[in-house]
A protein has these predicted regions:
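Compositionally biased, low-complexity repeat tracts
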Residues: 7, 56, 84, 89, ...
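Juxtadomain coupling helices with adjacent low-complexity linkers
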Residues: 11-54, 143-210
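Sensory/regulatory domains in signal-transduction proteins
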Residues: 115-162
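Structured interaction and signal-relay segments at domain junctions
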Residues: 48-125
């Protein structure tokens, strides 16, 4: 695990860490942490703003100046278990880490079922099972799943969706810049070579038919 941390202008601690980096062609580990930290600071600003806005908060005042976020790896195949498919976490506030299990449960359920955790909570509880989390929604933006926790269910959903959207947009911008730097190559890799997985898929083939 690698990570980074800082304090927001409003005084909220922001800590991020990633477990997987499927975008190594695009971002070093330190750069991925820096991106998560940048996006975490945006969420910290929103959390503080909505926590202190009182009746002016568009989705109601946030009850706590803290949150925990879990991002899943959008590139991970369905055969990879949830505990190995976590891309990283974003923790806001002194006790934001206490909400990571809730966020993980939402994100993990969403990945397993292929839909918002809240649907299972409210409509299909037979799909949850022992040890599942009883509250809240998860968000998915163009395949990027995020679970978030510590506010109301709707507030958690909004914040998860914002983080997912920001992450997808940031990766898209960096990917386009990478394409312009590299030109018309075939593979998303520093040496323009396929991943070992794709080589392994055809290792059994010995050559052209005679």
């Amino acid at each position: 695990m690698t990570g980074a941390e800082t304090v927001s202008p409003d005084g909220l601690n922001v800590h991020v860490a990633h477990r997987r980096n499927p975008y190594a062609y695009l971002l070093t580990d330190d750069e991925l942490d820096a991106l998560l930290l940048e996006l975490g600071l945006k969420r910290a600003a929103a959390i503080w703003r909505n926590h202190t806005a009182g009746e002016r908060a568009p989705r109601g005042a946030y009850p706590r100046p803290m949150m925990g976020f879990v991002l899943m790896d959008a590139t991970a195949g369905p055969w990879i278990p949830n505990d190995s498919a976590v891309l990283g976490v974003v923790v806001i506030g002194d006790r934001g880490h206490e909400y990571l299990p809730n966020a993980a449960a939402k994100a993990g359920c969403h990945r397993r079922l292929g839909r918002n955790n809240g649907e299972a909570v409210h409509v299909d509880p037979h799909r949850l099972g022992s040890g599942s989390f009883r509250y809240g929604h998860s968000a998915e933006v163009r395949g990027q799943i995020v679970g978030a926790s510590s506010q109301s269910p709707d507030q958690d959903l909004h914040e998860a969706g914002q983080l997912a959207a920001d992450f997808v947009a940031a990766l898209g911008e960096r990917h386009l810049a990478w394409e312009h730097r590299r030109g018309p190559e075939d593979w998303l890799s520093p040496d323009n070579a396929p991943a070992p997985e794709y080589r392994a898929m055809i290792d059994w083939y010995s050559g052209r038919p005679s």
